[in-house]
A protein has these predicted regions:
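Extracellular disulfide-stabilized recognition modules
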Residues: 161-179, 209-212, 227-274, 309, ...
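Conserved hydrophobic ligand-interaction patch in extracellular adhesion modules
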Residues: 178-205, 267-271, 276-307
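N-terminal signal peptide
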Residues: 2-48, 163-165
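Conserved Ig-like domain signature around the intradomain disulfide
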Residues: 63, 137-144, 252-253, 347
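N-terminal V-set
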Residues: 72-112, 196-198, 294
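Extracellular/luminal immunoglobulin-like beta-sandwich modules
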Residues: 27, 32-35, 73-81, 144-162, ...
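Core motif of extracellular immunoglobulin-like domains
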Residues: 67, 85, 141-143, 185, ...
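Ligand-binding face of N-terminal immunoglobulin V-set domains in extracellular IgSF glycoproteins
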Residues: 113-156
Length: 355
């Protein structure tokens, strides 16, 4: 104990000679603490810089989310920092960890394992590289730089180019709670859409009068042509909102989001029509699989698939995609037409084959 007191006295005397607190790589100003034991940098600021505009890309692509940091004023001696990348959740719950790094060591988490690494091509660069982007990778990412007690961060918005489509399952309208809605979208090669994705689709002309779940737990629907059955003609066009709903108790439809494909959707030409089971087998015989709803929408959006032939899809629905509206092919607007879920009858089939 005596040795410890002597050491403290010597440190205090030594620091008083130079007029500054004890130096350990930074000058700390103990007088500017907030009373909670925190210590702030004195005259040195940690700055983290990320792009202000969203980064747009596609499913399956590789992307770099830019992040740089520096000190103001610049330091002569490099500091050891810890880097943390995380993904903000749509419903504002705790962030999802993506990657942490300290020095040359780094660790990725969950579904990001094996697909992420830090790009450090220049001083202060700690950009995140994500390979083989997946549908659920879209969203906001936080780049956090930690130096002792100092912690600064920036946000990067990653957006996938894609298509939003309303979905109502076989058993009818307003039958899905939130968790069932998420599962339903996944089964159709899609994810539950975000509000931003729905808003963008509304700007592009999506008009749908049935309310559906979104990723943040709210229930909303887009109207471009106000009318009596959809909030009334007196309301202006826009996104109608039911607000946040109970994820287990309340039931609605869902808005799903899908992006570009790694394969091709095609109509299987055949002189005879199929039952649903025959349609599935026909695709398998052609070394493919029956297409999912999200895949048909993606082919319509990205591959400009235009076919006036109704065909089975994997969920038991019958649909067809129209890029150039024409007589006897439905309404005068482009879109994916639906025959619902026929219990009887024979139709063609849309197949999906990987590249």
């Amino acid at each position: 104990m005596l040795h410890f007191l002597v050491a403290v006295i010597l440190l205090q005397i030594d620091s008083s000679r130079c007029g500054l607190p004890f130096y350990n790589g930074f000058y700390y100003d103990h007088d500017k603490g907030n009373g909670n034991g925190e210590i702030h940098f004195n005259g040195i600021r940690l700055v983290v810089e990320t792009p202000g505009d969203p980064v747009f890309t596609y499913r399956g692509a590789n992307v770099t989310l830019s992040c740089h940091y520096h000190y103001d004023p610049q330091l002569d001696v490099p500091r050891r920092t810890r880097i943390k990348w995380s993904k903000l959740r749509e419903d504002s719950t705790s962030d999802q960890e993506v990657l942490v790094a300290a020095g040359l060591k780094h660790r990725s988490f969950g579904d990001f394992r094996g697909r992420t690494h830090l790009q450090q091509d220049s001083p202060g660069e700690v950009s995140l590289v994500i390979r083989d982007l997946r549908l659920h990778d879209h969203g906001k990412y936080r780049c956090e730089v930690i130096d002792g007690l100092e912690d600064e961060s920036g946000i990067v918005d990653l957006e996938l180019q894609g298509v939003v489509f309303p979905y109502q399952p076989l058993h009818g309208r307003y039958m899905l709670n939130f968790h069932e809605a998420e599962k339903t979208c996944r089964e159709q090669d899609a994810v539950i859409a975000s509000f931003e994705q729905l808003f963008k689709s509304w700007e592009e002309g999506l008009d749908w009068c049935n309310a559906g779940w979104l990723a943040d737990g709210t229930v909303q629907y887009p109207i471009t042509q106000p009318r009596k059955a959809c909030g009334g003609p007196a309301l202006s066009a826009g996104i109608r909102s039911y607000g946040e709903r109970h994820k287990n108790l309340h039931r609605f439809d869902v808005f799903c989001f899908s992006s570009s494909l790694k394969g091709n959707v095609y109509y299987l030409a055949h002189p005879q029509k199929f039952t649903l089971e025959d349609a599935k087998q026909a695709c398998q015989d052609d070394k493919a699989e029956i297409a999912k709803v999200g895949q048909l929408y993606s082919a319509w959006q990205f591959l400009k698939l235009d076919r006036c032939d109704a065909g089975w899809l994997a969920d038991g629905s019958v649909r067809y995609p129209i890029v150039s509206p024409r007589a006897k092919c439905g309404p005068p607007e482009p879109g994916v037409r639906s025959f619902g879920f026929p219990k009887h009858g024979k139709y063609g089939v849309y197949c999906y084959k990987m590249n």
